[in-house]
């Protein structure tokens, strides 16, 4: 499989290493901001890389969005987070002519976490819910795309909920329809997501802790391996 990388930061550098270990070839890179040197051919536009079978994106909206407006038919694996609603709209339009895979978190374990959450929320309707994520001190967006995804799952299963991002200005008790959303940044934390269900005299916590960023890179490579055999459409872990 020949791979074009969109972005050449820490994540796609891992993708390159792990993909080559699996026998795949990196045939080019699109990156206008990275200070890292690359041994691969560099391109400005997706359509310029004729050898690629698929593109894997770990970048940012500033780099990705203009590329999505171009004319090409290359399958895309998208891991960019931020500006989610706009991103999804663009990807759904693009998926009418080419296969597109998107996940806010490329870990299959996080996908399993969302499935567990779908089961837990209806069972624990009387419990308050708080969501917490923790990442390294270089992550610039907050809350994480994964935490937003977890909130979206809850919103579909519990009526009239609303997110609460900051409590220090509130001088009133918590309401049941609040979903607390908290972000922690520090050190080299790869990624941690905790769902707290707090009831009367008991709590339940569901957690996922990433121990290496390799899980995200391997998830993207695995998605690409399947996506290149798919018809045009919008794919997630649910239908890939």
UniProtKB/Swiss-Prot annotation:
Q: What is a single Pfam family found in this protein's UniProt entry? A: DapB_N
Q: What is its main location?
A: cytoplasm
Q: TM segments?
A: none
Instruction: Give the superkingdom in one word.
Output: Bacteria
Question: Which keywords does this Swiss-Prot/TrEMBL entry list?
Answer: Amino-acid biosynthesis, Cytoplasm, Diaminopimelate biosynthesis, Lysine biosynthesis, NAD, NADP, Oxidoreductase
Q: Which reaction does it catalyse?
A: (S)-2,3,4,5-tetrahydrodipicolinate + NAD(+) + H2O = (2S,4S)-4-hydroxy-2,3,4,5-tetrahydrodipicolinate + NADH + H(+); (S)-2,3,4,5-tetrahydrodipicolinate + NADP(+) + H2O = (2S,4S)-4-hydroxy-2,3,4,5-tetrahydrodipicolinate + NADPH + H(+)
Give GO MF terms, alphabetically. 4-hydroxy-tetrahydrodipicolinate reductase; NAD binding; NADP binding; oxidoreductase activity, acting on CH or CH2 groups, NAD or NADP as acceptor
Q: What pathway is this protein a component of? A: Amino-acid biosynthesis; L-lysine biosynthesis via DAP pathway; (S)-tetrahydrodipicolinate from L-aspartate: step 4/4
User: What is this enzyme's EC?
Assistant: 1.17.1.8
- Provide the top EC class: oxidoreductase
List where in the cell it is found.
Answer: Cytoplasm
GO terms under cellular component? cytosol
Q: Where does this protein hold NAD(+)?
A: 79-81, 103-106
Q: Which residues form the active site?
A: 135, 139
Instruction: Detail which positions bind (S)-2,3,4,5-tetrahydrodipicolinate.
Output: 136, 145-146
Alphabetical GO biological process terms: diaminopimelate biosynthetic process; lysine biosynthetic process via diaminopimelate
Q: What does this protein do?
A: Catalyzes the conversion of 4-hydroxy-tetrahydrodipicolinate (HTPA) to tetrahydrodipicolinate.
Q: Member of which family?
A: Belongs to the DapB family.
Matching entries from NCBIfam families are given as: dapB
Entry protein name:
4-hydroxy-tetrahydrodipicolinate reductase
- Please tell me the species this chain comes from: Staphylococcus epidermidis (strain ATCC 12228 / FDA PCI 1200)
Record gene name: dapB
